[in-house]
């Protein structure tokens, strides 16, 4: 067994695009949820309404995981993985375009619908991001790829 840095994977064309897609997707989801909460403070909504939206937002993001995880796994098994990654990344761009409209119009309903769709996109991407690694990494690289 050779001793090499797992960070060397980040220089590999077979891993870096996948890693960047995964990292930017997670960053996007977190920034978006926080931006919704920030908008509530900016709009000066009542404490009760702010509490409602602050609790509703994470629930709407998590709900698709409960509703669609099994279906997402089946879809991931049927479609070619790189194609599904392109589809889910395109979905993310479309959803964030919808969210941008929601921010411009300060429409909380539209922002929450986009948040639910973001959760759905993450649910669809989840099975692919875990199942593609064994097909693109060597056995000794899997620990670094998963970590």
Residue ranges of model-derived segments:
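Juxtamembrane loop-transmembrane helix junctions in multi-pass integral membrane proteins
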Residues: 13, 45-52, 83, 106
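Substrate-agnostic recognition of the 12-TM MFS/MFS-like secondary transporter fold
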Residues: 16-34, 57-95, 110-147
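MFS-fold secondary transporters
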Residues: 98-103, 118
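Helix-loop interface residues and adjacent transmembrane-helix termini in multi-pass membrane transporters
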Residues: 12, 48, 78, 104-105, ...
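Extracellular/periplasmic helix-loop-helix junction of adjacent transmembrane segments
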Residues: 35-65
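Short secondary-structure boundary/capping segments
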Residues: 7-8, 102, 124, 134
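Short helix-capping/hinge motifs at transmembrane helix termini and TM-loop junctions
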Residues: 44-46, 69, 102-107, 122
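Short, Lys/Arg-rich, polar N-terminal cytosolic tail immediately upstream
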Residues: 1-11
